[in-house]
């Protein structure tokens, strides 16, 4: 029997504060719960629910003994991420052993540089280069056909801008 999918968010330290950013807890816990509900509604993935009938989700540190119990982990707003040596080593081990990491919700060239520096501690870029997945790749058609890859703004930015732009962090953040 397969166990139910549990959304696993990583708690991490930030190296600075950022206007509008909230670090690891950006949109927590509602985003985690909503994603799990939609996953159960739109796919055949079995999702776990707790005793209050809320989607099961956990918050872990990279140093947590249970990290390797979860094949999928999520990190939000990684443009302020700071990994110490032990955390970087654990993340690298997790990924090399087949763990899946989804990162989301960071904007602009400064945040991208910060992320690349930190992930480079876990997976050196010479051995593990980061690259864009070509639009023609089958991953864009596994469950649904993806016709375009838009930049999705935060709901707060959408409200503030009246839906005029997706850029939270300046004109170049739409490209990075």
Question: How should each PLM-predicted stretch be described?
Answer:
Residues 12, 62-64, 69, 85, ...:
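Generic structural "secondary-structure junction" signal
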Residues 45-61, 103-108, 127-136:
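Surface-exposed patches in mature extracellular/periplasmic domains of secreted proteins
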Residues 15-19, 110-176:
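An acidic, glycine-rich "communication" segment
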Residues 40, 99, 120-124:
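Hydrophobic/aromatic-lined pockets within catalytic cores
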Residues 1-3, 64-69, 94-96, 124, ...:
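Extracellular/periplasmic catalytic domains that process cell-envelope and extracellular macromolecules
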Residues 30-34, 38, 86, 90, ...:
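Extracytoplasmic/secreted proteins, especially bacterial periplasmic and envelope-associated proteins
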Residues 7, 67-113:
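Short alpha-beta junction capping motif
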Residues 1-72, 76-79:
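Aromatic-Pro/Gly-enriched surface loop or interdomain linker
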């Amino acid at each position: 029997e397969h166990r139910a999918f549990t959304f696993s968010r990583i708690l991490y330290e930030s190296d600075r504060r950022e206007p509008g950013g909230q670090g690891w807890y950006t949109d927590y816990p509602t985003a985690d719960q909503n994603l799990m509900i939609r996953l159960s509604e739109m796919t055949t993935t079995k999702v776990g629910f707790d005793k209050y009938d809320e989607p099961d989700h956990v918050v872990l540190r990279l140093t947590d003994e249970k990290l390797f119990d979860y094949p999928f982990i999520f990190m939000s707003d990684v443009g302020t991420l700071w990994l110490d040596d032990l955390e970087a080593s654990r993340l690298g081990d997790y990924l090399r052993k087949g763990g899946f990491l989804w990162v989301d919700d960071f904007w602009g060239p400064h945040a991208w540089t910060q992320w690349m520096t930190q992930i480079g501690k876990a997976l050196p870029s010479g051995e593990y280069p980061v690259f864009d997945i070509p639009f023609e790749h089958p991953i864009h058609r596994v469950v649904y056909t993806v016709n375009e890859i838009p930049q999705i703004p935060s709901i707060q930015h959408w409200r503030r801008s009246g839906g005029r732009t997706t850029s939270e962090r300046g004109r170049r953040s739409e490209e990075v």
